[in-house]
């Protein structure tokens, strides 16, 4: 697997308003999230990163919502997302709204989210789609050092591979909002070519039972039936 860790640090935006069409992205993401928020229950919801903190989660039944980030506002717990100050299996829902694109070690961040999530806990991930108008603008040299084009845009399939290694069950994966400057992202284009959407969303749950059985382990654990040992009986004829 191609390593995702990078040495350089790119400063993440403090709010959605710092991004071109950022508020439109946030609204589009919230529209996609609301139907899923109604399915989530528990005691604690963890929002990791400044952009996650601004996501409206009123539709979620989890009342205790904590914003965690290294800096910025509104932050309730100031901490490094790669070293979350929470106990194992203590969080019901973990929201990573465009947190991975500006993370130096996405694998480590996902492992931290996996660590703090309870069994069957919810993990929500959003990011930018590299195969979109957003991805094309990233190819322009003048824009590469400005947000959001200085972020890392991971393909949907690559992120799904990461989650499968951590034994997450993906319930939903989509791309949407094809036109970044449009309020609704271009309804007609969203309906016919959603694969070119600028935004992508993954909703997954942490599972404890392996989703794919290992055939090698399965054959080892399978009880074996002993084969009958062949035997010959010698019968002596009675003497006359």
Swiss-Prot record:
Gene3D superfamilies reported for this sequence: Vaccinia Virus protein VP39
Any Pfam family the entry gives: Methyltransf_11
InterPro entries: Methyltransf_11 (IPR013216), SAM-dependent_MTases_sf (IPR029063)
Region named Disordered: 216-240
Gene Ontology MF terms in the entry: S-adenosylmethionine-dependent methyltransferase activity
Protein name, UniProt field: Uncharacterized protein YafS
Encoding gene per record: yafS
